[in-house]
Amino acid sequence: MSLPMDLTVLAAEHGDKAAYVAAESGEALTFRELEARSNQIAHLFRQLGLRRGDHIALLMENRLDLFPVFWAAQRTGLYYTAVNWHLTADEAVYIVDNCQAKVLVSSAPLESIAAQAAAGAARLQHRFVVGGSVDGVPSLDTAMADQPATPVDDQSEGYYMFYSSGTSGRPKGILPEMPDVPFGTGLTLDHQLPNFGFSPAAIYLNTGPLYHAAPIGWSMGTVRNGATAIFMSRFDPELTLKVIEERKVTHAQFVPTMFVRMLKLPQEVRERYDLSSLMLAVHAAAPCPIPVKEAMIDWLGPKVLEYYAGSESNCFFVISAPEWLSHKGSVGKAVIGRAHVLDAEGNELPPGEIGQLWFDGPDFEYHQDPEKTAAAHDERGWSTLGDLGWLDEEGYLYLADRRTDLIISGGVNIYPREVEESLAMHPAVQDIAVIGVPDDEMGQRIHAVVLVAEGVDAGTGLAAELSRDAATRIAAFKLPRTVEFVEDFPRLPSGKVLRRNLIADYDPERAVSMPRLNTQEK
């Protein structure tokens, strides 16, 4: 029996329509080509002995070669993990080994890290290369060339396995339960996308790296719904606008730092492009500062949609632009996983009070890590991602920070996000992170790390200006005492800043004092 989300059915219906398009080059992979290539790779996997529940890993830049491999795994009941190619060799080795991959497919430009990952992965049996030749490593194109372009006999749905943001150590692998359903049934996200307006007429623009949960899930789900997915090799703010205009993009996905970079384009550049085709600008992955989101809604209109979720898939919250305008700062109401706000003793807190967020949604476990799995669950079966937040009287969820990011200065809780939002839209600030650093008197001192905009002169003058500007929005006791101006931030694949790295790299010799303003302190 054929199911509507079976790629064979989609290829018969959409044929030479583009399934995936590389934004920069315009190179495309049609539905028909995707069907044939993914079938050939699927047969290769079966020939190599891979069976339902086995695991493969991929190590590639954003490129068309990824998708036939994704789909081959998806249609043969395999788990597949795309490894962040910006990781160190040690980190890549850990993921390829931890996920127990039997096959690794990598691109030729990443051979150095791929070779080390392969050498350190105990269960790896086969390795293939795309995008060039590597001595001693078989070409995937050559290996699949003689395989049939028709489906294998035992198709079933596979699943992607992600590694959640490693904000406090090694990335945590989230192993989902393999669905025991025929290929073509589709995954949960595939069936949710029509609620966001996805249809065969949709054109989706992915601006993020294809080793992260949302870009993979939405790019796969787009094609499942008969639509076209465009991807960028790396985010560029003006190119994004150009692609939206030229390709008539209907849906695009961002993280807040991308919004900031787009908003800081000159006005004449932003007005140069026709963005009228855009139905939804979806954002997630990190909290969006209120001034940034206000500016995006002013620019695009009520097309900005936010969701909050984790790779653990234990919750999913959504909020539209009209809802957000009357609940500024919220990440929405629950679609999956009701939220509970608990204090340190596990008691449920009333609306308006900040506590740790727990969810009674779908269960999960961290792969081969029972201690982290246990720490993320309580006796009621609820689970947490480690975030702090609160609920209002209407059930809208608001995020504060992660518990590990909280600053306690002079016995007072300081939430970095609030301080960051007070400065995020200053024209001299390209990005900002606020951390707590050791202080003999206060325990922790509030320290801002600022990535300055191009052409800005960083120094004591700018520090004073930022302090004055922030003082118009937040109480004086929340103002940073020192600031460091940097050229780049260490980041996770999602775009989140690695605060632990900033804390570890803190050097008081580089810190610039921010003036103490003559305002009453708490």
Where are the language model's segments positioned?
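AMP-dependent adenylate-forming
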Residues: 6-30, 132
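Structural core segment of the AMP-binding/adenylate-forming
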Residues: 7, 47-48, 75-145, 153, ...
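Conserved AMP-binding/adenylate-forming core of the ANL superfamily
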Residues: 19-63, 67-70, 88-93
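Conserved AMP-binding A3 loop
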Residues: 28-32, 159-186
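AMP-binding/adenylate-forming catalytic core of the ANL superfamily
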Residues: 87, 104-106, 242, 252, ...
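Gly/Ser/Thr-rich phosphate-binding loop
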Residues: 160-162, 166, 224-225, 249-254, ...
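Conserved AMP-binding/adenylation subdomain of ANL enzymes
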Residues: 181-203, 207, 211-251, 265
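AMP-binding/adenylate-forming catalytic domain of the ANL superfamily
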Residues: 472-496, 516-521
